[in-house]
Amino acid sequence: MASLIYRQLLTNSYTVELSDEINTIGSEKSQNVTINPGPFAQTNYAPVVLESWEVNDSTTIEPVLDGPYQPTSFKPPSDYWILLNPTNQQVVLEGTNKTDIWVALLLVEPNVTNQSRQYTLFGETKQITVENNTNKWKFFEMFRSSVSAEFQHKRTLTSDTKLAGFLKFYNSVWTFYGETPHATTDYSSTSNLSEVETAIHVEFYIIPRSQESKCNEYINTGLPPMQNTRNIVPVALSSRSVTYQRAQVNEDIIISKTSLWKEMQYNRDIIIRFKFNNSIVKLGGLGYKWPEISFKAANYQYNYLRDGEQVMAHTTCSVNGENNYSYNGGLLPTHFSVSRYEVIKENSYVYDNYWDDSQAFRNMVYVRSLAANLNSVKCSGGNYNFQMPVGAWPVMSGGAVSLHFAGVTLSTEFTDFVSLNSLRFRFSLTVEEPPFSILRTRVSGLYGLPAFNPNNGHEYYEIAGRFSFILLVPSNDDYQTPIMNSVTVRQDLERQLGDLREEFNSLSQEIAMTQLIDLALLPLDMFSMFSGIKSTIDAAKSMATMVMKKFKKSGLATSISELTRSLSNAASSVSRSSSIKSNISSISVWTDVSEQITGSSDSVRNISTQTSAISKRLRLREITTQTEGMNFIDISAAVLKTKIDKSTHISPDTLPDIITESSEKFLPKRAYRVLKDDEVMEVDVDGKFFAYKVDTFEEVPFDVDKFVDLVTDSPVISAIIDFKTLKNLNDNYGITRSQALDLIRSDPRVLRDFINQNNPIIKNRIEQLILQCRL
């Protein structure tokens, strides 16, 4: 089972980097599947996500990879990559605006000596010298800037995927150059981009520029496996303009019904209109200083027609994860300065709360199966004049981001008169051209959307899409469920969680590092520690239930469960008695602590025992066997337990959220290793992998086949002391083979000996791991 996971990396079905597989294992369950689609054209994939039920479609969601299309001549739109997929044609593409740009892509097969070939370019016969002494294909980009000039060789793309790209964007045409898998883009400027027309002589795909990262991936690593099959039939480009008859998708479906309640599924089209708001503060005095320019929440109310129904909608737009910039022109009172201005970019999010007066939102209290699909939108910044008393005004201009749908949750909006349950749509951001700058200052070439003039004169930005959810509503349509009974309102709990996170992180400076190291070196795990948390003994029963319930749904638990389900079957020959023994010892340690607490009843101890019993099973399935060694969960649990003991306001409601969050976020930089004889093979979550000898710590070539076999048949060990630390320790202090093996196995006794000897290298490594534990 386990070998299947890794052997798929080596088959022809698909190709991924080892880092991709490691990230997948550490985050969520995903699987690439190659499907034989049959003799049908795969031009337009259905723009819908299928769950246990389907979100019906009436609004087109733009596909990432649209095609393949037959060779044709047309004027491609701006902001779309043309992904060219030739077979053996010599001339791949010709593009010109007949004024200042003529560009042609020529395909040259591998192993061609220097020779002159005859090509027909733009109706003219040309002799061009080509050469390809590699085993890959080469795309020669030929260029001229006037009709009377000769073609010059401008760029070369050396490719083993035999794919090329062409894009019209921002007064330039863009192509790929370099060598795969590290090819990148470059451009040629033109004064008349809109008139550039192309003659494409090969099959091609169309990809939105917002998905340029996927285009880059295809160029460098090849098309997805579904596209590399003879059953994919190219169609004419005109198929993109086929008019489809709109189906009825704004519908109400009764899922189930009793005498008092019924379940209704609402499928709706949606148009979200929103705008940004900002706050610009100017200091008094001479009038040259601006202390703050920031984003503020913005409300917008509008009407639109949904399938013949007039809908009044309300949105509230807010931003999160703003980046603070500043500009200081000098120290004098007459020097222009902005102390802080906010910019949103890739690490930011935009939230849109949406509510309308339709039947779907009337009883939106008990909700399940919520799903949505939305298009993307580009938001461009405008100009803002800093009006100063004397001198030329600095002008902020430019900046743009694209918003991409990243999720939807339920929310509650409060006004002075009413509280409304609404949908909160979350959008991730990518930066776009042009960059922003402040005229007459040195601020230029920065990317993102600043808070100066984010709407750029637009009354609103608009996003179209659809959503669907199932509500439990009264059978009597005239009755409205009281909003105060809503199960979606969690403001108080969120506030407690926020306060608790801040308290946890501030406690880090107050906890002695030696105390944490001693605790981390005990055989401990995330669940058996509960019996030793003094502040939660009285609430052990409800707390244990809630923690297990929440952890079961966490991303870490899901990935561990899926991974170990396959690995444990394959590694059945590995003895697990040592791991069980480790768990029993850890349970006894913390049970002793709990028994010292006065006033704890037998029933509480029984609950603690039950929780510890559950932990035995979870510990066995953490990643694979640990063979008497310490793992990353031990350190996480030690830090968490120490902080919980010192925390002042732990409650049974907030603890499960903190436990679950810490298990997923603590120690993000992890590494794992397998050991065979005198050779160690180590991989980390960043995708780095290497092998080395135990005796000399000399690196040896990383054998993927051997790694596959070892993962199948051997325990996977947490690399508490990583290779870099081991090498440093050996170079500076010298360690025996026995010590090296114990450190590689993360033996707690040996680690404690090194720390008791005040070894700075080992101690520093443990401290670095503990310092990663932040919420």
Curated annotation (Swiss-Prot):
Residues 388-408 are annotated as: Hydrophobic. Residues 509-775 are annotated as: Spike foot. GO terms for cellular component: host cell endoplasmic reticulum-Golgi intermediate compartment; host cell plasma membrane; host cell rough endoplasmic reticulum; host cytoskeleton; membrane; viral outer capsid. It comes from the Viruses. It comes from Rotavirus A (isolate RVA/Human/Sweden/1076/1983/G2P2A[6]). This is Outer capsid protein VP4. A motif (YGL motif) lies at residues 447-449. The lineage of its organism: Viruses, Riboviria, Orthornavirae, Duplornaviricota, Resentoviricetes. Keywords: Capsid protein, Coiled coil, Disulfide bond, Hemagglutinin, Host cell membrane, Host cytoplasm, Host cytoskeleton, Host endoplasmic reticulum, Host membrane, Host-virus interaction, Membrane, Outer capsid protein, Viral attachment to host cell, Viral penetration into host cytoplasm, Viral penetration via permeabilization of host membrane, Virion, Virus entry into host cell. The record marks R230, N231, R240, S241, R246, A247 as: Cleavage.
